[in-house]
Amino acid sequence: MSSYVGVLVSDPWLQSQFTQVELRTLKSKFYSTKTRFGRVTVKHLPPVFAKLKYFNGKFDENEIKTILDESYPNRAKEVEFETFLRAFLSVQSRGSKGASSFLKTSTTTFHHSINESEKASYVSHINSYLKDEPNLKSYLPINPTTNALFDLVKDGVLLCKLINIAVPGTIDERAINTKKELNPWERTENLSLCLNSAKAIGCTVVNIGTQDIAEGTPHLVLGLIFQIIKIQLLADLNLKKTPQLVELVEENQDVEELMGLAPEKLLLKWMNFHLKKAGYEKQVTNFSSDVKDGEAYAYLLNALAPEHSTNVTLEIKDPSERATKVLEQAEKLDCKRFLSPKDIVEGSANLNLAFVAQLFHHRNGLSDESPKVPISVAEMVTEDEETSREERCFRHWMNSLGAVTYVDNVFEDVRNGWVLLEVLDKVSPGSVNWKHANKPPIKMPFKKVENCNQVIKIGKELNFSLVNVAGHDIMQGNKKLLLAFLWQLMRYTMLQILNNLRSHCQGKDITEADILNWANRKVKKSGRTSQAVSFKDKNLANGIFFLELLSAVEPRVVNWSLVSKGETQEEKNLNATYIISVARKLGCSIFLLPEDILEVNQRMMLILAASIMNWSLQQQSDTESTVSDDTDVSSVTEEISNLSTDDGSSDV
């Protein structure tokens, strides 16, 4: 009997670009090529692609080779299946006039030039913050005039360290492979850990794979590094960490409105606050064209550092000379690292943002006195910790899907319904009727409600529990309702991915109980003794069960000499931190925090187990793709089919 196994890839955006029929066809071509040559390299792709029906009559083998040479110049480089798919999309985007601009820019490397000034600035930042890092001492400082940076990132160690500088504690450094000579498997583990951790702190990496970093692809490496640095520089742009920002609240505004601003917009608001006080009559709305003449910087520096105040800068008419004088003033505050006069004059948005953020860090110019606000700021910013953690988890998960709109604050950004429609279209393609959707900016409230009503309608079609819930509830920003909806959306996405792996079976869909049964059976089969009664089982707090599960699916990934018994709170915390990094290192895209494990957050425990299950079954599916379709029963088929045969049902 012929079996059918759904084809999955780790990147949800990449998965969404293909139908299952297309994926199976391409996977068949990939593995037949691998069987024939022992491995697949870039040089094998042109003849394979030229024979595909899609490119018939559009490109010949030489034309495909020319296109791929631009993106993948090293023709001897071994290609993984996901890179094979990206290469296909690169060629496809050249042949399809209707291909979206997003597709063209995010799946190809055509016409990408490197901004040497940006590279030099990022290198300076890395040299400054990682200079005392033991694992990197022999490589630092990096020379910004060479391509040493792109070589140094290839093993993932530098990027992992940089992520921990941006958001301390994101990666358990015990999980990083740091020996001098890493084998390919260890390098891939580091790169998986890096990219999955980058997603978890808010970076958008839908167009970056481990191989892109392993190859040191310049524009992708610089793009990722900037995102990490930006997160670090904007980390204090919120009322919780800098309560003095409440001083920016205007008479016709409330604190909650200020709290809803994205960090980048809050930085602009801070800048304009000081410019207005200094007598600057214009409004700065961006970090590019509005600061090119250097005038705004001259006013800002005079306001922030009156002891260095001078009118000379404003009297200079030549933009380059004025920019030079601005940076001379900034240097007195130790704030020159990110910018050159040329960057100001040319309006480099990334570097100007970094420069202003640096100014904010060194001297924000805000009063330490308690501002006269009718409500307590502390009261406003201190919310339920679990709610805050869940908002962060869902926000980063939504951003990882590759939707066009970036989410900075779930409770504010989803209220017009548009973002939720974008996310729904990603997880359930074709579910959104875009003809009936209203694109921002939306001034009329009823238009927002229309979007939200469609969100609820689609949710009900996906069998979400939405009793007595209407679009108006979303528009009003009901936090409890929004978290419940997003949880169901995340759960639906994970279960759909798992169900694709059993789409050849006639049985029922995979349930939460099936995931628990699978995990228990995996651990037991590996010879370990831990078992979970449910995803609410308080014994999960010590972390042992999940470490044993990770070891069961990939024995070499857990270093048991680093694992404690999990008896004290400190030991539990160490295990929880290690679990998250090991799972990401394995290839799981997860967004939970150690606290979720320590408190046994049922929702996050389910997602963690499901992510490990997905990775495990996908590896078996990949392995068995080289076997003939006439194979009677694959281990994946058997393992998935047995999910619902365990005695009794578990309370998950």
From Swiss-Prot:
Region Actin-binding 1, residue ranges: 116-364
GO CC, one annotated term: cytoskeleton
Domain (Calponin-homology (CH)): residue spans on this chain: 116-233, 261-364, 388-494, 509-617
Xref: Pfam families: CH
BP terms from Gene Ontology: actin filament bundle assembly
Domain of life: Eukaryota
UniProt entry keywords in alphabetical sequence: Actin-binding, Cytoplasm, Cytoskeleton, Repeat
Localization of this protein: Cytoplasm, Cytoskeleton
Region ranges (Actin-binding 2): 388-617
Compositional bias annotation for Polar residues: 640-652
Region spans: Disordered: 623-652
Quaternary structure annotation from Swiss-Prot or TrEMBL: Interacts with F-actin.
PANTHER family to which the protein is assigned, alphabetical: FIMBRIN-4 (PTHR19961:SF66), FIMBRIN/PLASTIN (PTHR19961)
Annotated function: Cross-links actin filaments (F-actin). Stabilizes and prevents F-actin depolymerization mediated by profilin. May regulate actin cytoarchitecture, cell cycle, cell division, cell elongation and cytoplasmic tractus.
Protein name: Fimbrin-4
Source organism: Arabidopsis thaliana (Mouse-ear cress)
Designated gene of the protein: FIM4
